[in-house]
């Protein structure tokens, strides 16, 4: 089968994973930019604030274009990472700067896929971790931009983990994965409720609760404290570096780092 080919050619999997990561990262950039716009349009349409004559945006249409000059991006200018480097981070037509976030998301996804292929070679679990990485990267960037974790991403994390356990590709049994989800939800929801009473404000978003619960289906109930500890440390470091102080902190990226770090710690130790 396919894994037999990877055994015969051991470098094939890392190379394929890296290239696939660049391509998926390019698609994630589209999702990160367009999905919040799509939801705002749906809300405007629901409230009657958007006419049928106004153009709607989707993940497929319109084609990728420069947000400054509206020129459609040529195929040769849409190669993940390399096009940004060749164009020196500027639009070919209007010379407007292209955000560094685009190549960073592509590079981060490629590195995440590469690392998973090296730690879990010839494994369905390695593929599952790649999918998890894609969900978490998209969710984290959207949370950084909008301080909001869309349900579609937290549900993606949840169901990918449960399906991997059901297919016996996960280190966890399906029962352990479900237990991890339930423990994660009860723990963080209780913490959210208590913090709301004590602080008299929302200390944890519901998206954070759902993401923590979903990660429980990947790491198991016993490793959830590790996720919370790493996430809290990351949040503290982020707050100090950005000097956010008492302002709202997007906790989704911290939970994502905590979940991924815990998975690799479980594999390596």
From Swiss-Prot:
It holds the Pfam family Peptidase_A24. It is a multi-pass membrane protein. Residues 38-101, 143-176, 242-247 are cytoplasmic. Residues 1-14, 122-124, 200-218, 268-269 are periplasmic. GO terms for molecular function: aspartic-type endopeptidase activity; endopeptidase activity. Keywords: Cell inner membrane, Cell membrane, Membrane, Transmembrane, Transmembrane helix. GO terms for cellular component: plasma membrane. One of its GO terms (biological process) is signal peptide processing. It is found in: Cell inner membrane. The chain crosses the membrane at residues 15-37, 102-121, 125-142, 177-199, 219-241, 248-267. The keyword Kinase does not apply. Belongs to the peptidase A24 family. In many other E.coli strains this gene is part of a type II secretion system, but in MG1655 the locus is missing a number of genes. A pre-pilin peptidase involved in a type II secretion system (T2SS, formerly general secretion pathway, GSP) for the export of folded proteins across the outer membrane. This is Prepilin peptidase PppA. It comes from Escherichia coli (strain K12). The gene is pppA.
């Amino acid at each position: 089968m396919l894994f037999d080919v990877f055994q015969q050619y051991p470098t094939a999997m890392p190379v394929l994973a890296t290239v696939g990561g660049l391509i998926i990262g390019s698609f994630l950039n589209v999702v990160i930019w367009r999905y919040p716009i799509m939801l705002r349009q749906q809300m405007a349409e629901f409230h009657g604030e958007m006419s049928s004559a106004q153009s709607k945006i989707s993940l497929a249409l319109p084609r990728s274009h420069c947000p400054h000059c509206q020129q459609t991006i040529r195929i040769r200018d849409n190669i993940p990472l390399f096009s940004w480097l060749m164009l020196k981070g500027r639009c070919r037509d209007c010379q407007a700067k292209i955000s560094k976030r685009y190549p960073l998301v592509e590079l981060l996804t490629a590195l995440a896929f590469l690392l998973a292929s090296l730690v879990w070679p010839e494994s369905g679990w390695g593929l599952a971790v790649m999918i998890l990485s894609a969900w978490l990267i998209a969710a984290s960037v959207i949370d950084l931009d909008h301080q909001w974790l869309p349900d579609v991403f937290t549900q993606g994390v949840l169901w990918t983990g449960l399906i991997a356990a059901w297919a016996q590709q996960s280190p966890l049994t399906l029962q352990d994965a479900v237990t991890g989800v339930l423990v994660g939800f009860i723990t963080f929801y209780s913490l959210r409720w208590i913090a709301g009473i004590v602080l008299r404000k929302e200390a944890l978003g519901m998206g954070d609760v759902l993401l923590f619960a979903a990660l429980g289906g990947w790491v198991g109930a016993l490793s959830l404290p590790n996720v919370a500890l790493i996430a809290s440390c990351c949040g503290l470091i982020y707050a100090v570096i950005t000097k956010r102080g008492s302002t709202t902190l997007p906790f989704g990226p911290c939970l994502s780092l905590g979940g991924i770090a815990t998975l690799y710690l479980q594999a390596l130790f």
